[in-house]
């Protein structure tokens, strides 16, 4: 089976490396090089770099026009495998592949159709999520389910953590799906009545209100890592929150909302909220390295009693 691989994200790199061991990858479709770093020099994504290193033809157009369709048609692929690309495919593009098109989606479809399933699961405080290998349809993330595997989300897991987990789980699931397809399996239709949807996070998604519950705040902190990251102020200085947990207790009702009320070397830096205690686990001062809460506490002047304020 000749495969046309489509991705623009590092989350798909392990899948790509595994697929080329077992199948002929006749081409790769990815996004164009983008400016990166202080110098804003054009930089390839890791999928493009890996494909070039393996002498696999790469297409990186701005738009999927007729010229791109003809280039893909000339490669004579059997199947398209998509994992985090960022563009919508029209019917004439999907029709190029006689054995169909499949997609790796990091949720338990039909839950969280859309572009931010990992972040949405964490933002909503889900304890379980998963990976779905689905056939592709014109309606986004509505195709038949070929393979599905669930996993637990720990209370302190970030979007970055779950992305790494999805990356490690996906190669074997894709191989399983391709084996099923080779045997004529068409997949199991989704229950569209149970579908939920998610959209892009925005920069302002990193704003928090300490009047919310500790559960809601820690979900936002963890969901927004690695982007856009939650920023607050402490003594007129910006502080970035990278990881948090929470306690469902109200021990400090008389203290100010957002106040640092305690330090526990086993649990975290305690912050009072509208309901419960926020446990800060990893923080950063802009331009400096990310610190665990112990290093942040030991490297700061008296923190207990200081108050975090929201950035609006």
From Swiss-Prot:
Keywords: Protein biosynthesis, Transferase. The keyword Lipid biosynthesis does not apply. Pfam families: Formyl_trans_C, Formyl_trans_N. One of its GO terms (cellular component) is cytosol. It comes from Borreliella burgdorferi (strain ATCC 35210 / DSM 4680 / CIP 102532 / B31) (Borrelia burgdorferi). It is an enzyme of class 2 (transferase). Belongs to the Fmt family. This is Methionyl-tRNA formyltransferase. It catalyses: L-methionyl-tRNA(fMet) + (6R)-10-formyltetrahydrofolate = N-formyl-L-methionyl-tRNA(fMet) + (6S)-5,6,7,8-tetrahydrofolate + H(+). (6S)-5,6,7,8-tetrahydrofolate binds at residues 107-110. Attaches a formyl group to the free amino group of methionyl-tRNA(fMet). The formyl group appears to play a dual role in the initiator identity of N-formylmethionyl-tRNA by promoting its recognition by IF2 and preventing the misappropriation of this tRNA by the elongation apparatus. Its EC number is 2.1.2.9. GO terms for molecular function: methionyl-tRNA formyltransferase activity.
